[in-house]
Amino acid sequence: MPASVLPLVEAAAHWPARGALVGLDLGTKTIGVAVSDPDRRLATGVETIRRKTFTADAARLLAIAGERRAEGFILGLPINMDGSEGPRAQSTRAFARNLARLTDFAIGLWDERLSTAAVERELIGLDMSRARRAKVIDEHAAIFILQGALDRLATQRRTSGPG
């Protein structure tokens, strides 16, 4: 059965309580990939995929998910500052729908507003060269997106209590 593409908290209801999640920062040329630990406390960068075709990109993402025994995907949704969705958000939703056809994992969408800008500031603060930043920014943005989503899910669990 194809997966569902849902807002983060709704997607989480479809995931088991434990198991890694794969976070994605979709760009036009690359996809930053991060994976959580099985307890969903910490996001770690995995790689930056140079985009080729959807089929090739999806195959690599599904391979990573399999290698890491992941239970779901979280995609950063680039919402505009006014809350509207522009072409990049529509492209992300289309990618998520296409990926959902290839997996049973629920796919969660997480507001990634300002994630790349925040990561860029952090890397500049580390005195990283522009060339080095360009190589790692997408993977670091995926970490930022996934960690934000993990923190939100942890808060949700604490405030809603057991069951």
Swiss-Prot record:
Q: Which GO terms describe its molecular function?
A: nuclease activity
Q: Does the keyword Transit peptide apply?
A: no
| Keywords associated with the record | Cytoplasm, Hydrolase, Nuclease, Ribosome biogenesis
* GO BP: any one term: rRNA 5'-end processing
| EC number(s) recorded for this UniProt protein | 3.1.-.-
Query: Which SMART domains does the protein's record reference?
Result: YqgFc
- Tell me the InterPro entries matching this sequence: RNaseH-like_sf, YqgF, YqgF/RNaseH-like_dom, YqgF/RNaseH-like_dom_sf
One GO cellular-component annotation of the UniProt record comes to:
cytosol
- Does this entry carry the keyword Nucleotide-binding? no
Q: Where in the cell is it found?
A: Cytoplasm
- PANTHER family listed in its UniProt record: POLYNUCLEOTIDYL TRANSFERASE, RIBONUCLEASE H-LIKE SUPERFAMILY PROTEIN (PTHR33317:SF4)
Q: Which family does it belong to?
A: Belongs to the YqgF nuclease family.
Quote the function comment for this protein.
Answer: Could be a nuclease involved in processing of the 5'-end of pre-16S rRNA.
Annotated protein name in UniProt:
Putative pre-16S rRNA nuclease
Q: Top-down, what is the taxonomic lineage of the species of origin?
A: Bacteria, Pseudomonadati, Pseudomonadota, Alphaproteobacteria, Hyphomicrobiales
